[in-house]
Each structure stands twice: as C-alpha cells, then as structure tokens.
C-alpha cells in the first residue's frame, strides 16, 4: 500500500471508531468532554505509532507461537511509558482518564494493527499506519466528545487546561448554562445513542455517494438511469 492509501484507510475508509467499531469501551466511556477525548486520543495515537514500529522490527524474527504474547508485552511497555509521562506532566488529565489509560493495553485496535498489518510491513509503513489509525480514532473521539460536552454541559473545550496547562483555564466556550444540558449526554447510554446516530449519518452519506457515483457511471456509459 502507498502512503496515501494508508492515510485514507486509517482516517476515513476504515476509521477504527466509526467504521470498524474498535475500541468502543474507551470511545463511549471517556468521550464526555473534548479535553478527555483529546487526551486519550493522543495517548492512543502515540501507543499505536510506537507499538507498530516495534512490531515491524520484531515481528519477522519472532516464532509464530510466541508472537502475540511478545506484542502484548511491547504494547504494555509503550502504554506504561505514555501513562508515566502523562502522570508527570498532565496529572489532572491523568486522574480524569483514570483506568482507561492503562486499559489501552487491551484495546483490540492496538493489538490488531500490530498483528495484522505492522508485523508484515516495513517500519516506515507500520509507523504511517499507526499514525493514520491513531488519527482516525482521535477524530472519532473528538467528534463524539464535542457533541456530548455541548449537549450535556453547554460548553466546548471547558477543561482544556487539564491538557494545555493553567494558562488555558476558562479558554473554552460556555454556550448555555450547564444546568440546562441533557444529563443523558454525559452518561454512557447517551454516548451509545449519539454514536449510533453518527454511524447512521455516516452510512447515509456513503450510500448517497455510491448512488451518485453509480448514476454518473451509467450516464458516462450512455445508459439512462432507471432503464
């Protein structure tokens, strides 16, 4: 695969959160605010890049019988590094993400990319795939986090100081009073419903594009649509 195809598949065509539905547990549980979504998304992106690189370097040299176990250990090392870094530099965000940060180790997205793609590709392609898949997952988290924060708290980016530092306290937008927000949007059931609506909208857009492309192909071939 060329670089453009890898990027397109990771971010759009095979978006891990909105198309493959991988990593639903953190996607639904942590995306209550833009800050939480951005923090976990960046952490997952970093783990994907590092674990894919390690899998590409070690995979061809590992016996098939122990490959999965070694990949889990490599992923655990990457997650531990990210978690300790976040605990040192962003303690507020680290506390807000809680158990879901170390649970990146069990995220099926990370292990699936290491086993099914990175271990069979060059290090450069593996790193690019990790970046593309991580970016796709980050965008899915941000989209859901923005909708949930807006509907549930009436704000956007209200807690970005957890990630960017005290200088950004109050840097978000409070669009309407928090008391007027929808409580269900802050909870996991609301996240599940909103994700379903986002998936339905995405499917409708893709279906419309297929119909338009199909009609264009028929017209180009000289066949009247509907004949």
Language-model features, listed with the residues they occupy:
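Short, membrane-exposed interhelical loops at transmembrane-helix boundaries
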Residues: 157-186
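C-terminal ends of transmembrane helices
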Residues: 51-64, 111-121
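Hydrophobic core segments of alpha-helical transmembrane domains in multi-pass membrane transport
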Residues: 24-28, 44-45, 49, 76-83, ...
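Hydrophobic alpha-helical membrane-insertion segments
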Residues: 130-155
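Intrinsically disordered, low-complexity non-transmembrane regions of multi-pass membrane transporters
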Residues: 1-8, 162, 166-171, 206-227
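Cytoplasmic-side transmembrane-helix entry/capping segments in multi-pass membrane proteins
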Residues: 62-75, 96-102, 126-129, 215-216
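Structural signature of hydrophobic alpha-helical transmembrane segments
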Residues: 34-50, 70, 94-105
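Transmembrane alpha-helix boundary signature
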Residues: 81-97
